A protein has these predicted regions:
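Bacterial Sec-dependent N-terminal signal peptides
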Residues: 1-26
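N-terminal cap/lid segment of alpha/beta-hydrolase-fold proteins
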Residues: 24-62
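Short beta-strand element of the alpha/beta-hydrolase
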Residues: 65-73
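Catalytic nucleophile-loop/oxyanion-hole region of alpha/beta-hydrolase
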Residues: 74-75, 103-139
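Conserved alpha/beta-hydrolase
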Residues: 76-84, 88-109
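Alpha/beta-hydrolase-fold enzymes
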Residues: 147, 151-195
Length: 195
């Protein structure tokens, strides 16, 4: 009898856990309104605790296997409905990722934008690309703005031998500090060494 009860208990725990994980990872209507859905995905914890990333999508009415994944910049999140609609009208499924500790992915106890290395965002991009492919998209282009341009450029460089996307579109990428010679070669190294 005890063995039978133990099996029932284990079944109930597994069933509840699976239901919780599945309900957490389902698309739900997004704050952008009609035609936009968001899915929040639990990621492995980092040095500050729990981490999530959020995938927002707007699907084209065309029968298409093409998609764009948009990566926002610093102190930002995805809100550009017109951008998504423009890609949808051009027969692209549109996706955007709110990176960990930004926008929809910022949890109450977190410090906004806190990462120690930009490569921490690669897991968010990999997760988004995997989900986009699982939804039947085979031709995927990354698009990024500002610091997202720096992150995606580093991502593509790190994956140069097995690039998981067909292209990269950069919108006003943050690739350089744009300082004069004195600041860049003299002042910044002194201030950096000083701490």
């Amino acid at each position: 009898m005890i063995k039978y009860m133990r099996h029932i208990f284990i079944f109930i725990v597994v069933w509840l856990a699976a239901g919780t994980i599945c309900s957490f990872a389902q698309y739900k209507p997004d704050r952008l309104g009609e035609g936009f859905e968001a899915k929040t995905i639990a990621m492995p914890d980092d040095y500050s605790g729990k981490v999530v990333t959020t995938l927002v999508r707007s699907l084209s009415s065309c029968d298409t296997h093409k998609a764009v994944l948009y990566v926002h910049g610093y102190n930002d999140y995805f809100f550009q409905k017109t951008l998504a609609r423009t890609f949808n009208d051009s027969c692209f499924n549109f996706y955007a990722v709110d990176l960990r500790k930004y926008g929809r992915s910022l949890l109450p106890e977190q410090t906004p934008f806190e990462v120690r290395d930009l490569q921490e965002y690669f897991a968010d991009i990999d997760t988004a690309l995997t989900l986009i492919r699982e939804e039947g998209n085979t031709d995927i282009v990354l698009m990024a703005h500002s610091t997202g341009g720096l992150i995606t450029s580093l991502y593509c460089e790190a994956h140069r031998n097995d690039l998981p996307v067909q292209g990269l579109i950069l919108n006003s990428p943050f690739l350089d500090m744009n300082m004069n010679w004195f600041y860049e070669k003299i002042l910044v190294p002194i201030v950096s060494a000083w701490g």
